[in-house]
Each structure stands twice: as structure tokens, then as C-alpha cells.
Design a protein with these regions (language model features):
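Mid-chain, well-packed structural core segment of small domains
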Residues: 61-63, 67-99
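Cytosolic, membrane-interface loops and tails of multi-pass inner-membrane proteins
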Residues: 22-48
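Core segments of transmembrane alpha-helices
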Residues: 52-64, 115
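Transmembrane alpha-helical segments that form the membrane-embedded catalytic/substrate-channel core
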Residues: 12-29, 85-94
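Alpha-helical transmembrane segments
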Residues: 3-19, 68
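Juxtamembrane boundary at the C-terminal end of a transmembrane helix
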Residues: 120-147
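Small-residue-rich segments of transmembrane alpha-helices in multi-pass membrane proteins
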Residues: 2, 41-44, 106-121
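Interfacial loop-to-transmembrane junctions
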Residues: 90-116
């Protein structure tokens, strides 16, 4: 089964991941810093933008993939995925500026809101149509019963 929403945004995330990596590498060469940030604040911020991306995107893609598989996909998932990618871009640009700023705050806040929303949606979908496990019907609020 092809998951077009998940594949589209996994591809977009891979491209963004490379872009964030290049932003770090382009600073490392002229600064001659191979490992760590060498005390350079700009490099440290770009490294954290890259790291934060790497920390948040995997759970987003897992949730997106399972929800698309469970629901067949819908406009809400497309919208959440578009907003998540835009939030990650905003966060990366916001990290270039020292201190808290609107891009950084909006980027991380929107990312967290989307992850929370997808997490709640996943839990709701999981119990919307109870699964059948080897002839055992499991329903919330009722005891399990054998099905023919």
C-alpha cells in the first residue's frame, strides 16, 4: 500500500534535513571547527536547529504514517503535514537569531501542537473501530468475547 501523504512529507523532511546539515557544514569549514561548536554562537544555534529537527521529525512521520494507514488519509493529515514542515522551516530561521523571537517560538509551538494533535488523533482512531486479534473481539468498556 502506498502512503502518499507520508511519502511526500518524508521526502520533504529528507530535503530539509540535508538543507539544515549544509547550513551547519558551511559554517564549520571557514571556522575550522570539525566537532562541536567551538564556542561559536551561530554554529551552536544552527546545530540545535538541526538537532531539534532530527528529534521531532521521526515521531511526526511515524504518527503520520500510522494515521494514514489507519484512516486512508484525509485533508486534515495533508494540512497537518504542510503546517509541520512550515513550522520546522520557521524554527530553523528563528534559531539564526539570538534569543526568543517570533519565528522560533511559532515554529516550535506549532510543531508541538501538531504532534500533540496527531498523538490524540492516533489514540482516538485506535479505539474507534476495535481490532480483532485471532478471533478475539476487543471492545473498550466490555470484556473480550470469542468471535466465530
Amino acid at each position: 500500500m502506498i502512503l502518499p501523504i507520508t511519502l511526500t512529507f518524508a521526502g520533504a523532511a529528507a530535503i530539509l534535513h540535508i538543507w539544515l546539515s549544509i547550513r551547519v557544514s558551511r559554517l564549520r569549514r571557514p571556522l575550522k571547527i570539525g566537532v562541536g561548536d567551538g564556542g561559536n554562537e551561530v554554529l551552536a544555534r544552527r546545530m540545535r536547529a538541526h538537532g531539534n529537527f532530527a528529534e521531532n521529525v521521526p515521531i511526526f512521520l511515524v504518527l503520520l504514517g500510522f494515521l494514514e494507514l489507519a484512516t486512508g488519509g484525509n485533508l486534515w493529515l495533508w494540512g497537518a503535514a504542510i503546517l509541520f514542515i512550515l513550522a520546522r522551516i520557521a524554527h530553523a530561521f528563528g534559531m539564526d537569531r539570538p534569543g526568543a523571537n517570533p519565528l522560533r517560538v511559532a515554529g516550535i509551538s506549532l510543531s508541538w501542537a501538531i504532534l500533540l494533535g496527531l498523538g490524540v488523533y492516533a489514540i482516538l482512531v485506535a479505539y474507534q473501530n476495535p481490532p480483532i486479534y485471532r478471533g478475539l473481539q476487543v471492545s473498550p468498556g466490555r470484556s473480550a468475547s470469542l468471535q466465530p
